[in-house]
Design a protein with these regions (language model features):
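Conserved double-stranded beta-helix
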Residues: 1-56
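Residues immediately flanking
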Residues: 27, 44, 111-112, 132
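Residue-level detector of short, conserved catalytic/binding motifs and their immediate flanks
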Residues: 38, 106, 128
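A short hydrophobic beta-strand segment most commonly corresponding to one strand
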Residues: 42, 124-137
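Double-stranded beta-helix
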Residues: 50-115
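Short Gly/Pro-enriched loop/turn and capping motifs at secondary-structure junctions
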Residues: 114-117, 135-137
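Short proline/glycine-enriched turn/loop segments at secondary-structure junctions
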Residues: 119-123
Length: 137
């Protein structure tokens, strides 16, 4: 079913060009109620290779002790966020997120263990997307 245990929700995310309307790279498992969800990203408007939701390929397989993350409510580049940010791997290497080409009418599904976010909209248009989750009943 769609929605968390409790109220069901579909979020409309609006990310303006070159603004801090995004979350930093993170995993949804940092919230207990999202651990067992399947994430869905559905583009509505302004989604392209410069504005799509970034995701780190294969990161859903990484052990948590292989990453460095902040506390909740980190301040990064002067912006306060509500989710702990994954800043790097423990070996000091940078995170190499990609922006999948998700076409209109398609949905990108991904694990709550996948590192995603950090997507400054580098395009010229506002990015609008639906974000929702499925839970096993």
């Amino acid at each position: 079913y769609v929605g968390p245990p409790g109220p069901k929700s579909i979020q409309i995310r609006i990310v303006r060009p070159n603004k801090s309307d995004f979350n930093p790279p993170h995993r949804d498992i940092y919230y207990d109620n999202l651990r067992n969800a399947l994430n869905c990203f559905m583009p509505i408007f302004g989604v392209n290779e410069k504005s799509s939701l970034p995701i780190l390929k294969g990161s859903h397989l990484w052990k948590e002790n292989k990453t460095i993350r902040t506390h909740k409510y980190p301040i990064i580049d002067g912006n306060k966020f509500s989710v702990p940010a994954v800043t790097s791997k423990k070996d000091g290497s940078f995170l190499k997120l990609i922006r999948p080409k998700v076409k209109y009418g398609q949905v990108m599904l991904f694990s709550p263990y996948a590192i995603h976010g950090g997507g400054v909209n580098l395009g010229n248009e506002v990015r609008i997307s639906f974000e929702f989750r499925f839970w096993k009943k």
